[in-house]
Amino acid sequence: MNQTGSTVAINLAKKLYDAGIRDNLVLQAIANTPREMFLDAALAHKAYENTALPIGQGQTISQPYIVARMTELVMQNRPQRVLEVGTGSGYQAAILAKLVPELCTIERIKALQIQARQRLKRLDLHNVSFKYGDGWLGWPNRGPFDAIMVTAAAASLPTALLEQLSEGGRLIIPVGEDAQQLLAITRKGQEYSSEVIESVKFVPLVNGNLA
């Protein structure tokens, strides 16, 4: 594993390896990304705990294991163009931007989008396109996408996102309300195969924009 990250970030990546994450590129990206940059100063001391944390606006930064697991699932086919639905703090986007040539990310809460854009700029990540909008609708004029990652739980599968997958593309999405499951959905022509990965708990994927 690349050892250029901070000691605490490297230790987190080692813990994720012990938890079953095996993609070395994903682990390196986590080891080299300062998670504290994506949190309020009052929570910075918790940055490398394997737990979800609040980021304001009723949203959270996902626990590092889930970030790593979803990224690993996205990266199985080494995608060229990826869509992230739910930019949030920007942490997941930062991890993805280090791994794929082109990342598009959508956020419905303007304040979060502005903060995330500033953070990724400070990290010198310039292969990311940001959109303020409704994630349920995707980003049709930038697709199709080799992979789509949704970082909030949908009550049902968003049809627009399925349609924006390229042939062989994968949608990684938590689905459900009280009982949620992380699904990996692969497009084959006009058909889609679905695999249940594990049980998860995410904030809900909400329709529409929030200023």
From Swiss-Prot:
Gene it is expressed from: pcm
An example Pfam family from this entry, by short name, is PCMT
Gene Ontology terms describing biological process = methylation; protein modification process; protein repair
Where it sits in the cell: the answer is: Cytoplasm
Per UniProt, the enzyme's principal EC class comes to transferase
The record's keywords, sorted A to Z, are: Cytoplasm, Methyltransferase, S-adenosyl-L-methionine, Transferase
Q: What does this protein do?
A: Catalyzes the methyl esterification of L-isoaspartyl residues in peptides and proteins that result from spontaneous decomposition of normal L-aspartyl and L-asparaginyl residues. It plays a role in the repair and/or degradation of damaged proteins.
Instruction: List the InterPro entries hit by this protein, alphabetically.
Output: PCMT (IPR000682), SAM-dependent_MTases_sf (IPR029063)
Q: Which GO terms describe its molecular function?
A: protein-L-isoaspartate (D-aspartate) O-methyltransferase activity
Organism the protein comes from: Shewanella amazonensis (strain ATCC BAA-1098 / SB2B)
Q: Name one GO cellular component term.
A: cytoplasm
- Tell me if ATP-binding is a UniProt keyword of this record: no
Name the NCBIfam families for this protein.
pimt (TIGR00080), PRK00312.1 (NF001453)
State the active site.
Answer: 62
EC number(s) per entry:
2.1.1.77
Reaction(s) catalyzed by this protein?
[protein]-L-isoaspartate + S-adenosyl-L-methionine = [protein]-L-isoaspartate alpha-methyl ester + S-adenosyl-L-homocysteine
Family per record: Belongs to the methyltransferase superfamily. L-isoaspartyl/D-aspartyl protein methyltransferase family.
UniProt protein name = Protein-L-isoaspartate O-methyltransferase
